[in-house]
Amino acid sequence: MKYSGYHLVIDLFGCNFDQLENTEYIIEMLKKLARALDTKIVAKAFHKFHPQGFSGALIISESHITIHTWPEDAYIGIDIFTCSKCFDPRKIVAYLKENLIFKKVEIKEILRGKID
């Protein structure tokens, strides 16, 4: 069976408040993640909420990577969507563990656009 896209939904719980509020760090971490996945960034958008929180999007040649933070809830939501299954979710979690402080991770893998 063939699919148009592969969507990885990552929820991180028990995140470090100070790290979530460091938007420069989160932006660099997101860009490094894109490079680690061997994707090309073609556009980016970032927004800092007040008093806290952050959303960011990288449009990559293969689709997109987004992040949303809720420091007050110690939570990060990350979505990675690509037109091919070109990455291993275990490697992404290992990368996140190396670069972010969190207590729990939940991952959902979704196959999108079934082609008959």
From Swiss-Prot:
Keyword Metal-binding included in the entry's annotation: no
BP terms from Gene Ontology: spermidine biosynthetic process
Annotated GO CC locations: cytosol
Keyword Transmembrane helix applies: no
EC number, UniProt record: 4.1.1.50
GO molecular function: adenosylmethionine decarboxylase activity
Keywords carried by this UniProt record: Autocatalytic cleavage, Decarboxylase, Lyase, Polyamine biosynthesis, Pyruvate, S-adenosyl-L-methionine, Schiff base, Spermidine biosynthesis, Zymogen
UniProt record similarity statement: Belongs to the prokaryotic AdoMetDC family. Type 1 subfamily.
Subunit structure: Heterotetramer of two alpha and two beta chains arranged as a dimer of alpha/beta heterodimers.
Cited PANTHER family: S-ADENOSYLMETHIONINE DECARBOXYLASE PROENZYME
Protein name, per record: S-adenosylmethionine decarboxylase proenzyme
UniProt source species: Clostridium botulinum (strain Hall / ATCC 3502 / NCTC 13319 / Type A)
